[in-house]
Structure formats: C-alpha cells, structure tokens
Amino acid sequence: MIKVKNAKFITSASRITQAPPPILSEVVFMGRSNVGKSTLINTILDSNLAKSSSTPGKTRLINFFETCWEDMQTNQNLTFNIIDLPGIGYAKVSKAEMEQWKKSLWEFITKRSNIKLFIHLIDSRHLGLEIDENLYNVLESFLRNDQNILRVFTKADKLKKNELAKLYQKNGVIMGNK
C-alpha cells in the first residue's frame, strides 16, 4: 500500500511552453468537463489543492502538482507529478477559447515526454458517449510503450444498485471514497 506524504501545487500553464520542465514522471487526469477530475485529485491527495466546482469548465489551465508517496511496506518514497487538465467538451467559454484549449491540450498530451499514465475519467451515469470513446481512441493512437491508460468511472454513488452491478460486471473494479 502507498500513502501520500505530501503534495503541493507547482504552477498552471495554458500551453506546453509554460509547463515546468519534465523532470519527474507524470500522471495526467483527463475527461469530459465536470466529470470529477479535480475532485478525484483532491480525494486522492486528501487535500483541496485542485480547484473544483459544479460549474463545467472551472479548470481552464493545465495544473501541475508535485506529489510524494510512501510505500508502507518498504518505507521507500516515490515522487511524481499529477496533472489536472481542463475538461473536454462543454464549458462556458467562447468557441475561439475552446479551439485554443483543444490545440494546447493536443500538443501537451502528444509531446510531453514524461507522461506515464493517462487517467481517463468517465461519468458512470453516461457510459458509451462518443466524446469518451473518441478520447480513448485518440489516446491509443499515439500511446508509447512506456505509457498506459486507466479508465476510472466517477459518480458511481449516483447509480442504482442494479446499475452499479452492471458497471462492476463489465469493468471489474469499483471503488468509492465514502
């Protein structure tokens, strides 16, 4: 088991040239707007470092957090960055701003050399959406051998028991923070 020792906000960037140098391995949280990326990051880090809101499009920049974890069995530390990306899809922004986001995000996820894991968050109440399938397919299209994709289904607490059972049967793992 690993446990977070500490986490801190590093910086926000609107494009890859503003990002901190890729020194540590990186884990990217991505998905549709308002799927719970920032909330999940805060839950995992047991903090309120990532700004979250019920308003879609709250995260408008690429946010970097440095984290240090302790392996409880070996007492060894592991340090890596967590990256909170703006949501894909709906947000209360202009069309021009949305296009700039898409361009910046594409450049970031395809060119950032230290990304090792893409955590693709999917709202468990809205499975099979084209936007989620497209995102997964895009990630697979450029995935390197040293990278992985992990699908995480959020908002499972809003499902009925039979819907939760179907989600579990199809995907195998269900976790909660309550």
Residue ranges of model-derived segments:
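Conserved C-terminal guanine-recognition region of P-loop GTPase G domains, centered on the G4
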Residues: 77, 102-176
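Conserved G1/Walker A P-loop phosphate-binding module
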Residues: 1-92
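Flexible beta-alpha connector loops of hexameric P-loop NTPases
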Residues: 88-98, 157
